[in-house]
Amino acid sequence: MKNSRNKQGNLNVVGNKIRYYRELNNLSYQKLSDMLMLYGIDIHKQSIYNIEKGLRTVVDYELCGFAKCFKITVDDLINEFFKELNK
């Protein structure tokens, strides 16, 4: 099955938000990767970079892990996407 890209050519809609919250929390790619591992989610730092750049998809449990690491809700990561859909 071919991966779908959004209008900007990205494979996900949360990469910019993940970068925003990672930087807001002063987390390196490695530190975020280590934090995700504490929740049993094995994402290499290069994969986090690829997610932020829209080069990799994000599965549901990864999205939940990112939200837990940033102490936010999944909705905080995806709400801008839904706002765009409703325009």
Descriptions of predicted regions:
Residues M1-N25:
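A short, Lys/Arg-rich alpha-helix, primarily the initiator
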Residues K2-Q8, K68, D75-K87:
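Short, charged recognition helix plus adjacent turn
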Residues V13-N16, N26-L27, I43, V58-Y61:
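Residue-level signal for the short linker/turn that defines the boundary of a DNA-recognition helix
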Residues N16-L38, G65:
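Short basic helix-loop element that most often maps to the first helix and adjoining turn
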Residues I18, L32-S33, I48-I51, L77:
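Conserved hydrophobic/aromatic packing and binding residues within compact polymer-binding modules
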Residues M37-T57, E80:
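Recognition helix of helix-turn-helix/homeodomain-like DNA-binding domains
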Residues K53-A67:
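Short, basic-rich loop-to-helix N-cap that marks the start of a DNA-contacting helix
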